[in-house]
Amino acid sequence: MLDDITTQLKSRRALFELIARDMPPLMADMAAQLVEAFRKGNKLLVMGNGGSAADAQHLAAEIVGRFKMERRALPAISLSTDSSILTALGNDYGFDAVFRRQVEALAQAGDVVLGISTSGNSPNVRSALQLARERGCRTMGLLGRDGGSIRSLCDLALVVPSLDTPTIQEGHITIIHIVCDLVEKALFA
């Protein structure tokens, strides 16, 4: 059991060393684009499925509430959290449309629409990002593996290069926390 723990921790360390080496410019770009959008009065729409839905909800909560510093609220909406909307849209339009329909209702040009997908291939995230691009939104992805089919729909894609879903999710939440910190410092420090 202890060997398994050590192996898993070494694997995580290697991934975080890779993130530390390759992703700081991408995280800085993500934060800068969010800061610009918030300064212009735009909002963040964020979505994902399963654990990525939890990450989307977590990110929206940090942006609307606060991350580390007391400050004014910023506009962010998780498209993964309203069970009535999700089940109505899933029932009436199919699960592939649950995020797209919300983007249709809520997104305006200049908004940031962020899709979180450990596979990079979630059809409902892909469909929503496609519509967001057509509407003049900035599209971003927090993705895993090789970025999948969603990568090409993103103006900015941060890809955690692992095949292990829990490890990808750990990378995503770390990136989310760093970006939240950068956004707060840029807008309120």
Curated annotation (Swiss-Prot):
Entry EC number(s): 5.3.1.28
Cofactor note: Binds 1 zinc ion per subunit.
Disulfide feature: none
Superkingdom, natural source: Bacteria
Reactions catalysed, as given in the entry: 2 D-sedoheptulose 7-phosphate = D-glycero-alpha-D-manno-heptose 7-phosphate + D-glycero-beta-D-manno-heptose 7-phosphate
Binding site for Zn(2+): H58, E62, Q169, H177
A GO term from the CC aspect: cytoplasm
A GO molecular function held by the record: carbohydrate derivative binding
GO biological process: carbohydrate metabolic process; D-glycero-D-manno-heptose 7-phosphate biosynthetic process
Subcellular location: Cytoplasm
SIS domain segment(s): 34-189
This protein's UniProt keywords: Carbohydrate metabolism, Cytoplasm, Isomerase, Metal-binding, Zinc
HAMAP family to which the protein is assigned, alphabetical: GmhA
Function statement: Catalyzes the isomerization of sedoheptulose 7-phosphate in D-glycero-D-manno-heptose 7-phosphate.
Assembly behavior: Homotetramer.
Similarity remark: Belongs to the SIS family. GmhA subfamily.
NCBIfam families noted in UniProt: gmhA
Protein name stated in the entry: Phosphoheptose isomerase
Organism whose genome encodes this protein: Pelobacter propionicus (strain DSM 2379 / NBRC 103807 / OttBd1)
Gene that encodes it: gmhA
